[in-house]
Amino acid sequence: MERDSFLVAGAQTAFVDASVASDERYRPSLITNSQVDGCSLLSVLKREFSSCSSFDLCVAFIADTGLQPLVQVLSSLRQRGVKGRILTSTYLNFNRPEVFAKLLEYENIDVRVYQGSMHAKGYMFKQGDVSTVIIGSSNLTQTALTCNREWNVLFRSYETGDMLASVRSEFEELWASSDTVQLSKAWIEEYREYRKTHQVKSAPNKKTFVSNAVEALGTDDVICPNKMQSMALEALK
């Protein structure tokens, strides 16, 4: 019951009256990587990973630079047997095969790939009867986690909360989608070959990769940026 009051007070401070006293740990907040408050999304993710009992991530783009700062905490989760799920994508064929291979090294993490235009960025951490959710603009890239000015909203909820239920429902729908495949070594090799043959420097690939082993339903062409636009997009992530 005491924790109920913490969540209610936190919501009042965030959405009703900023002068209401509340525990900052239960208060919805905006994470921007601002140097003023010294709070980066990377530091928040490390904290949540370290204290969670399970986690679900839905992130379109994952780069080596985004995984590397999390290696230590992810290895700790593996040693502790903490289970997690990561749903990523082949959108714009941004993710490198090496990143997928790295994710496969964590046997405690179930990884699936949505083969289509999925651009979500959401992080869910469960700790007891309370979950922490972060939804916003940051993919798992170094700049998006540390120095880019991003907008990521963090909130906490009981499992019975409506907002959390909506987020989990969307995650489960994408997780079970016919456009989603289980990450495997065979899939990674197929994806690697696809990128080699389709990503021509002078003419960017206009189709998102879809494994030949999976029948894709309603997969349409997506607009791809040119080389200079791609470099600009990477700098923004």
Predicted feature descriptions by range:
Residues 1-235:
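PLD/PLD-like phosphodiesterase catalytic module centered on the HKD motif
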